[in-house]
Amino acid sequence: MSDRLLRGLWVLCLIFCITPAVAEALEVSATAAVLMDADMGQVLYEKNGDRQMLIASTTKIMTALVVLEHAAPDDVITVTPNHMAEGSSMYLRAGETVRVEELLYGLLLCSGNDAALALTECAGGLTPFVALMNEKASALGMAHTSFANPNGLDADGHYSTARDMAVLAAAAVENPTFRRICSSRSVTCSPSARVGARRCAS
């Protein structure tokens, strides 16, 4: 899993091991933070928990969750020039075909912005995919969240809060495929006619 995304999940998933007594004594330097008992939904600690902020690559937690609910691992996506993106990448090439599961590894291990865009084809393209992200956020009760893209690049109308992201993390780790991918250190993706074997590593 990418270092940035992993750090984000570790912060969010401290909810599983911090007791209320410890939470009371916490001091954090982050602008905003929430610790939550994932089983009970009880907030143990918060600092600016409802402040709307940029969420960068932690966006990809929602991207993965939406894909896992709307596509099969063996579904195949054809990469197009529209899937190329700035920033972190799994180095996709236009014209190659990639399985959804391999794109999920590229999304969560490499923090691939290109993988995020390619995965929007699971919903028929960027606009309907982002709509699904916002529908899922609403279903989870993420009342102070709005998604504008699947990779977390800064954009108008793209924000969340520490509280909402704690809710999202708790939902994501309930998915066994999400847990399996995020627990991997590396994976080698199958070669295609256009690209040789590709290794994704955290």
Predicted feature residues:
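Short, well-structured active-site flanking segments
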Residues: E69-N82, P176-S184
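Bacterial N-terminal signal peptides
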Residues: G8-C17
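Conserved catalytic neighborhood of penicillin-recognizing serine enzymes
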Residues: E86-E121, R198-S202
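Bacterial N-terminal signal peptides that target proteins for export
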Residues: M1-L9
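Active-site SXXK
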Residues: M40-G41, L54-I77, M165
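Penicillin-recognizing serine hydrolase domain
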Residues: L26-A30, G125-S202
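A short, well-structured edge-of-sheet supersecondary motif
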Residues: E24-E46
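Acidic helix-start/capping segments at beta-turn-to-alpha-helix junctions
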Residues: T78-S89, A155, T188-P191
